[in-house]
Structures are given as C-alpha cells and as structure tokens.
Amino acid sequence: MAKSILFGEESRRAMQAGVDKLANAVKVTLGPKGRNVVLDKKFGSPLITNDGVTIAKEIELEDPYENMGAQLVKEVATKTNDVAGDGTTTATLLAQAIIREGLKNVTAGANPMLIRKGIKLAVDTAVEQIKKSSKQVDGKEDIARVAAISAADPEIGKLIADAMERVGNEGVITVEESNTMATELEVVEGMQFDRGYLSPYMVTDAEKMEAVLENPYILLTDKKISNIQEILPILEQIVQQGKKLLIIAEDIEGEALATLVVNKLRGTFTCVAVKAPGFGDRRKEMLRDIAILTGGEVISEELGREIKDVTLDMLGTAESIKVTKENTTIVNGKGSKAEIEDRIGQIKRQIEETTSEFDKEKLQERLAKIAGGVAVVKVGAATETELKERKLRIEDALAATKAAVEEGIVAGGGTAYLRAIKEVEKLTDNNSEIRLGIAIIRRALEEPVRQIASNAGLEGSVIIDKIMNGQEGMGFDALEGEYVNMVQKGIVDPAKVTRSALQNAASVASTFLTTECVVAEIPEKNPAPQAPGMGGMGMEGMY
C-alpha cells in the first residue's frame, strides 16, 4: 500500500482541521443550554445524544490526515470517559483550545518541545489547585446535585442519590431499559446471585413461583451430590430442629434430588437446592463469600471435608432467603461482622492489584454483593429514541456521582478552571518559550466558560471578566443567566472529572504540537468496471 507524507506546518494544519471538525460537533452539547447531536445508525432509529464520547466515537473523516487529528482528540474523550466516566465534552474542548493556541506559537517559530514543558508545568499547577479547592461530598443532597448537573435533570439526580443511599458507596448500581414509560429504582437488599431452584416442585409460593425460607440453614459445597446417603445424616439433624435448608452445590441430581422433592411434596421437610454461582476459581471464591456472609463453611474435598461428616455448626444461617426460577437472594446473613470486613478489605486489595478490566468488574460485583447490595435504575421513555438518550444521560450521571464520592466536588460551570488561572499566572520561567506554554494553558482554562456562555447565546469574555474580578466561589449560572455562588446554588462538578479532562487534553494536545511529519495511506482507487461485451453486434470493419 502506497503512503502519502506531509511535513511541518502543512501536516499540522491538515490534522488540526480534523480536530476542529470533531470538537465543533461535540462542544455544542456543553452546559445547561447545550444542544443535542443526532447520530445516524445503520440499523434502527437515529441516536440523539449530548454525550461527548458517544458523539466522538461515531466520527470518521474521509481525508486521512484530518481523520488522524480527529482520532487523537477521540482518544482524549475515551480516556476521560474510562477514568472519570464523564467530562468528555470538556476534555475535547480543552484539547482543541490547547492545539489552537499552541499551533499559533509553533507556526511563529517557537520550539514545541519547550512549549510542551510549559504546558506540563501549568497543568500540574492547575490540577493541584483543583484538588485543593475540592470539598468532600456531604450526604445525599450533594450526590443529588452532582447527578442532576451531569444529567441536566433534577429527577435523575434524586433517583441516583436514593440508589447511593440504599446500597452505599461500595454497592453496585446498574442501568437497564424498562418495559414501561416510567423511570424507577429497584433495590436488591442482601446478596443475590443468578442461580435459581433446580426443581419447580421446591417452591413455597405456587402463585409467585418462588421459595421463601425464614431462618434456614445453608449447606455450601463445591461437590456434586447424587447419593442421598451422603446428606442423610445432616438432614436428620435439621428435621429434628424443625428448620428448613438451602443447599448450594455444584449440582444435585438423581436419587438425591428426587428424595428432596418427594419429602417437600409430602410436607415432611422443606429443602431448596440451587447450583453454585460462577465457574472455576471464581465459583470457589463466591462460595467462600457466601460462607463468610452466613457464618458457615464450604464443604470441599480440597479442605479434607466430606458431606457425610457435616455437623450443624458447619452450616450457614440467614434471616431469610428467596429463590426464584433465575435468582437466589440471601438477606441478613448471620456471619461475623469482623470476618465480613476482612473479606471486603481483601477483595478491595485484589481490585487495586488486578490489571484485567474483566477481573476488576467481577471483583467489583462480588464486593457489592458482600458489602451493600445492588440497585437497578430502570429507564423508561415514550419512544426508543428518547430511551437511548435518557439512558446515556443516567449512565453519565452515575459515573459523575461515583467520581464525586472518590475525590470530592468543585464549583461547576467551568468556574474551577477560572479559579486555577490565578495560580497558573503566578508561574514564571527564565525561558520565554516555556512561558508561552504556561500562557497557552492560561487561555485554554477560559474555554469551558466561553463555550457554556456561547451555547446560552451570551458573550463569554464579559462573563469571564466578571467572575475573575468577583468574590471567591462566584460563577455564572447559564440556565438562569445570573452570577451566583456556585457551590451554594448546587452547581458542582466532581473534582476527578475536572482534573482528568484537563490532564488528558493537555497530554494529547502537547504531543500533537510536537508533530513534524504525518504519514498516511493513499486510498486505493477501484478501477471502473468494464462494460459487458455485446456479442453478435459486431460489423465488418468496425472496432
């Protein structure tokens, strides 16, 4: 495949055109008066969204040089989304501003390597200021504010705050599509795993087709049970106690399953059997989680334990257990608080150490199940188009909320960046080109407020001047068109989102400025298909 090469100013300008096309498409969504972007889909209805990263991912440009520029800025949005889950529009906007200001200076003959140094110095200072000015999230109200600003909807803010309150910071909150028009919150208290009863004859409520066991014993094993003689000794002890039993095993089949079902139907003894959750090593760990939560032991040959030797003190207990066709929920396991805390700490350490995203996700699920619970936000809307748009906004709001809990909140509406300018202005250096890098960031930090104002139909420069000369904490509420104390008014952003957007934008933009040559593939031209021959039409002497 032949390649095309561009050098110097020409290469940077070609890539900048791509950066501008992508950034201009994304930045119209910024702020409370930002608009939506409609994305064409090959299948189904178009997607309407104001989510920066979703828009960026859809953009592919025909010109290979422009496309390279667009892909670089796309990385800014994607990385910010991965780290903080929100702030992708701000990150794209900042990258565009740094590239625009930087290229002016590089074109005028400044050394891009020294400019890059100045950019890094200014960004580090601004990030430090953002961290210093952040305050910890204090209760449900702060969480609701962060989510409401991110989703541009107070109702969504309230819903997510409720979910966080119910499952705690360690709990898992998922977003699913609802079959109704209403958006609702569904919370699963206790530990739930996706395994249901092995036989429908085990249900205690035939109408709802579920088995509910109050204060039952729980037998946990990683073995397959097929011989009833293995579990007969422990069954006899439980019958004498007048209790019910939940068996969680690799499988229960044949004679053992048939005997349990017959005894249940006769009313002699209630026992529900379910398969153990997970696979391989993950199954062993999940059984251990359940054992710690319920105060029982896992009966495993690896540990030298046989099912026939099980005693009552090896069984777990819980306040209640609900088993449906697909799920088992254990509520209020009677395990030791200290052991549960140790297990939570152990899983947290594993999350920090693992490099696999898949493992991290699975560990996070296990942590939620043992620590808090699972909340499901069921998103409803009148049409599929609105549903998709709403779901994206809720996912962003959820990510913003988690980021706020991690690193606290700062004044929203781009105000935190303006406050950081004062610290950046204090920086100085003997080298004039490093000073240029600092000045580029100083100018770029104004860009979010400019764009929010522009999307609201106002002049950004006037607003920036007023905020910079105003009291500490003052910012511009673009929705109401007034100057207010941003934190008191509840216009806040997560510090992690604000910080990540700036760091990722500067990282890609400063590398962009050091480009001196661009190599792209020349697209192959497909030869035009030849016209089919017209047999039998030839005439003598004619070709």
Swiss-Prot record:
Binding site for ATP: 29-32, 86-90, 413, 477-479, 493
Catalytic activity, reaction form: ATP + H2O + a folded polypeptide = ADP + phosphate + an unfolded polypeptide
Superkingdom as given in the UniProt entry: Bacteria
CDD domains the UniProt entry points to: GroEL
Location in the cell: Cytoplasm
EC number: 5.6.1.7
Pfam families associated with the record: Cpn60_TCP1
Cross-referenced Gene3D superfamilies: GroEL, GroEL-like equatorial domain, TCP-1-like chaperonin intermediate domain
UniProt KW keywords: ATP-binding, Chaperone, Cytoplasm, Isomerase, Nucleotide-binding
One annotated GO biological process: protein refolding
Molecular function via GO: ATP binding; ATP-dependent protein folding chaperone; isomerase activity; unfolded protein binding
Family designation: Belongs to the chaperonin (HSP60) family.
Assembly and oligomerization: Forms a cylinder of 14 subunits composed of two heptameric rings stacked back-to-back. Interacts with the co-chaperonin GroES.
Protein name, entry field: Chaperonin GroEL
UniProt source species: Clostridium botulinum
